[in-house]
C-alpha cells in the first residue's frame, strides 16, 4: 500500500464527514440535557467510522472498473488508482468490519441497532446482486434514509426518547444531502443540466427539504440556529461558486465539511449567553406568530 493511500482513500476521506454527522445528534442532546460521556462518544464515533470505512472500500471494490475511467474520482479512489491493492483492500474491509461492529456493540443497544441499519442500507445500495445505486429513485431514497440514521445516531447513543429531538430538521438535512449526492454522482459538471435532467427528483426533494425546514423553525426552541446557519451559509456558498472553477471538483469535499461544521457551530453557539438571549427573543416572536396564525385559522 502506497503512503498517499493512507489519506487518499474513501474510508479516510469520508471519516470526518461521518463523525460530524454523528456529532450533530450528540450536540443536540447535550445542549438540551447537559449530559454527555466522552468515552462513550469516542467509542461510538470510532465504531461508526470504521464500519462505514469498510463499506466504502467494499463499494470501491465493486466499482473498480467504473472508477478507473472516472477522472474526477481516480485521484482519491485508492483501489482504482492502484495505491491500495485488491488483496490489501479485502484485509482492510475485514479488519474495519470487525472493529466497527465491536465498538458499536460496546456503545449500547440503541446505537448498535442504528449502526446495523446503516450498514444494511449501504449493502442494499452497493451489493452487486442488489445494487440499488443503479436505480435513480431507489438510490436517493436509500441515501436519504442512511443520512437520517447517521444524523440521529448521536442522539440515540444516550436515549431512546424522541422528546426534543428535531426530526423535521434531520429530515431536511438528509434530503439536502441526497440532493448534493445527486449533484456529485453527475460529476458536478453543470447544475442547470443536472436539475433539468433530474427534475422529477430534484423538485419534489427540494420541496420536501424546505417544507421540513419551515416546520422545524416553528416547532423547536432554537430559531436563532436557523438564522446563524443561513448567515454563515450564504458567504460559504458564494465562495464555493467562485472557487469551483479555479480549484476544480476537489473543493466539493471542503464545501461539504464546511456545511456540517456550520450546522454544529450554530448549535454550539447556543451556549453563549448573548446568543441564548437572542434565541429567547426570537422564540417569543415565533410564539406570537403561531398564535396569530392559530386565531386566523379558527376565525375563518
For every predicted segment, state its role.
Residues 64-116, 171, 199-222:
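Multi-pass membrane catalytic core of lipid/isoprenoid biosynthesis enzymes
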Amino acid at each position: 500500500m502506497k503512503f498517499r493511500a493512507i489519506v487518499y482513500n474513501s474510508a479516510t476521506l469520508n471519516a470526518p464527514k461521518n463523525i460530524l454527522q454523528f456529532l450533530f445528534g450528540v450536540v443536540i442532546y447535550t445542549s438540551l440535557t447537559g449530559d454527555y460521556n466522552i468515552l462513550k462518544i469516542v467509542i461510538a464515533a470510532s465504531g461508526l467510522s470504521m464500519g462505514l470505512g469498510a463499506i466504502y472500500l467494499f463499494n470501491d471494490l465493486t466499482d473498480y472498473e467504473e472508477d478507473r475511467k472516472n477522472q474526477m474520482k481516480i485521484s482519491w479512489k485508492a483501489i482504482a488508482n492502484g495505491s491500495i491493492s485488491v488483496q490489501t483492500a479485502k484485509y482492510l474491509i475485514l479488519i474495519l468490519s470487525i472493529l466497527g461492529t465491536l465498538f458499536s456493540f460496546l456503545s449500547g443497544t440503541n446505537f448498535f441497532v442504528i449502526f446495523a441499519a446503516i450498514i444494511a442500507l449501504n449493502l442494499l445500495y452497493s451489493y452487486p446482486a442488489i445494487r440499488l445505486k443503479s436505480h435513480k429513485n431507489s438510490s436517493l431514497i436509500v441515501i436519504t434514509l442512511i443520512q437520517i440514521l447517521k444524523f440521529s445516531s448521536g442522539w440515540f447513543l444516550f436515549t431512546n426518547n424522541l422528546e426534543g429531538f428535531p426530526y423535521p430538521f434531520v429530515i431536511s438535512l438528509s434530503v439536502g444531502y441526497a440532493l448534493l449526492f445527486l449533484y456529485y454522482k453527475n460529476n458536478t459538471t453543470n447544475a442547470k443540466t443536472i436539475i433539468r435532467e433530474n427534475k422529477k427528483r430534484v423538485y419534489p426533494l427540494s420541496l420536501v427539504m424546505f417544507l421540513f425546514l419551515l416546520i422545524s423553525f416553528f416547532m423547536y426552541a432554537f430559531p436563532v440556529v436557523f438564522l446563524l446557519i443561513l448567515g454563515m451559509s450564504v458567504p460559504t456558498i458564494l465562495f464555493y461558486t467562485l472557487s469551483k472553477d479555479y480549484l476544480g471538483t476537489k473543493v466539493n469535499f471542503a464545501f461539504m465539511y464546511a456545511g456540517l461544521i456550520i450546522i454544529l457551530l450554530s448549535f454550539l453557539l447556543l451556549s453563549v449567553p448573548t446568543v441564548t438571549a437572542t434565541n429567547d427573543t426570537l422564540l417569543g416572536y415565533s410564539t406570537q406568530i403561531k398564535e396569530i396564525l392559530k386565531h386566523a385559522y379558527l376565525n375563518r
